[in-house]
Amino acid sequence: MAVGKNKRVSKGKKGAKKKVIDPFSRKEWYNLKAPVTFNVRNFGQTLVTKTIGTKLATDGLKGRVFEMSLADLNADEDQAYRKIKLSCEDVQGRNCLTDFHGTSVTRDKLCSLIRKNYSLIEAFADVKTLDGYNLRMFCVGYTKRRPGQLKSTCYVRSSKVRLIHKKMVAVMTNEASNSTLKELVKKVIPESIGKEIEKACKSIFPLQNVLVRKIKVLKKPKFDLTKLMESHNYSGEEEGHTLKVKESENATNLLTAELQSS
């Protein structure tokens, strides 16, 4: 028998179940708001740990990047091949105000455009928009058979590839430098930049299926809350409207009626 051992002291059972705490009880939901560039403004919700002491919930939300299909943001299934990245820039109440953070084309779309006996031409350019965003734009295009061509293959010489590269970079730089980020996104979605490249390269070699494959945001300007609010058309007027009810002509003030009767 061990010295000093007290048999009367009851021991706790080994392997006793610990109290299970639901992890979701410490979290809360926030709504995600897309800029006015897209048709669907409320595109989802996100979870974040509740504010505890000096750790604010909003600090955990700012900087988060969300990737969505353009088909969901514009309610158009024909645009499902393009993905859009939106980053949370500010939090207003329970709403996360997001801004454009990049775009890319799905791998399925790119693989569907590749054809045998045709040349693939790629180019990229570092551009800067009017509102101070530094972007890197990637472009891709494919050769096209000339009318009346008898040759089965449609390859292009390296000398012409270099000329097409220069045209692609020039068009992307020109389109970005003469527009804001919002205007540039509106050009990328309907593939208007790709059509401009096709027109510019027509004299060198005909191209087809030209599109902006990817856009990366390299550097953003200093955060401006006013511009972010403008991109969301956000105002406090959505809450607390003053309700004006038109009084009917037959209605009579009770106090006036009492005075008249007396």
Curated annotation (Swiss-Prot):
GO BP, one annotated term: translation
Quaternary structure and partners: Component of the small ribosomal subunit. Mature ribosomes consist of a small (40S) and a large (60S) subunit. The 40S subunit contains about 33 different proteins and 1 molecule of RNA (18S). The 60S subunit contains about 49 different proteins and 3 molecules of RNA (25S, 5.8S and 5S).
GO molecular function term, any single one: structural constituent of ribosome
InterPro entries assigned to the protein according to its UniProt record, in alphabetical order: Ribosomal_eS1, Ribosomal_eS1_CS, Ribosomal_eS1_euk
Alphabetic keyword roster: Cytoplasm, Ribonucleoprotein, Ribosomal protein
Family listed: Belongs to the eukaryotic ribosomal protein eS1 family.
GO cellular component, one term: cytosolic small ribosomal subunit
Ranges that cross the membrane: none
UniProt-recorded name of the protein: Small ribosomal subunit protein eS1
Primary location group: cytoplasm
Source taxonomy: Eukaryota, Sar, Alveolata, Apicomplexa, Aconoidasida
Cellular compartments annotated: Cytoplasm
PANTHER family in alphabetical order: 40S RIBOSOMAL PROTEIN S3A
Source species: Theileria annulata
Superkingdom field: Eukaryota
